[in-house]
Amino acid sequence: MSANDIAVESKITLSRNVKGYPFPSRLRDTRANVIASGVYEALARDGGYELYKIAQMSDDICKRLRERGLISDRLTESPYGSAIVSGDESVSVMINEEDAVVEQYFGKGECLSALYEKATAIDDEIGKKEEFCFHPRLGYLTSCPDSVGTGMHASVTLFLPALALTKSLQSCASSVSRLNISINSVYDDSVEAYLYTVTNQQTLGLSEAEIIDLVGKAVNHLIEAEEKARRMLKISSESQVRDKSMRAFGLMKNAYKMSATEMMELYCWAKLGAYYGFVSFDTERAASLIKSLMPAAINTAGAADEEVYRAEMLRKELN
């Protein structure tokens, strides 16, 4: 398994406020739409972007965008909030969220450096239309003190089942915390998906390049630790892992009904089994399939019974 099988997704978030406008906590009128129009105009030069206004958005579309991480819960509660999303969903810009402009950039695997180049180019284009609040000493001014400075958070989502199963994750988290890097589970404790987000905590006093470097070092450390833990796991628990991964893959291919939580947990065990060669399937293709079978995505597709439809599609695609 390559590093990109452990590193699932990279994300860069840039938080900005606009000169001459109140911060979102006080911007509760149609002036937020003026900002949205300016940002959309800057992005629309390249085409392929769609503007969504929260007040005019259907519940199904709102849930789908939220499920895919393209908008936040906070934005959905903003009556003057908007989102501008690229057709391939690799770029999402939220307007009137915690800050006036919150840019999100997504990429597969560990690709922070390339993603930052893309983010910088688009941020510069937006900056030509909207003058950002910038202090010569402090940097970008944001609503939350944790974002002041670069206004940038760089994160990578990692699949770390062996570190979790061997109880080694906490010690790894402690070691990278010295770099002001946090590790947080993507899901709550009730879901055993073994997905964790690695993110910088410091935005002030560091350049964007230094942040990318620090997060990259933490990610590399965790990938090496996961690879070592997988070798140890095979030595200590091969029969248990083989059995659980084969059962998981068998259920994915044969169940009549399946919840989204069960699907995620089974996929993660099947993916670990694929790493060891216990089962054989295209994990990347399956990951795309699973994204299309989350609750809001299925509701948008108009399926009568969500769990029956999910299991039917898994049987169809995996057999």
Task: Provide a role label for each language-model segment.
Residues V148:
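Active-site His/Glu-centered metal-binding helix of metallohydrolases
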Residues M1-R137, C144, M152, A164-T166, ...:
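Long, Pro/Ser/Thr-rich low-complexity/intrinsically disordered regulatory tracts in eukaryotic proteins
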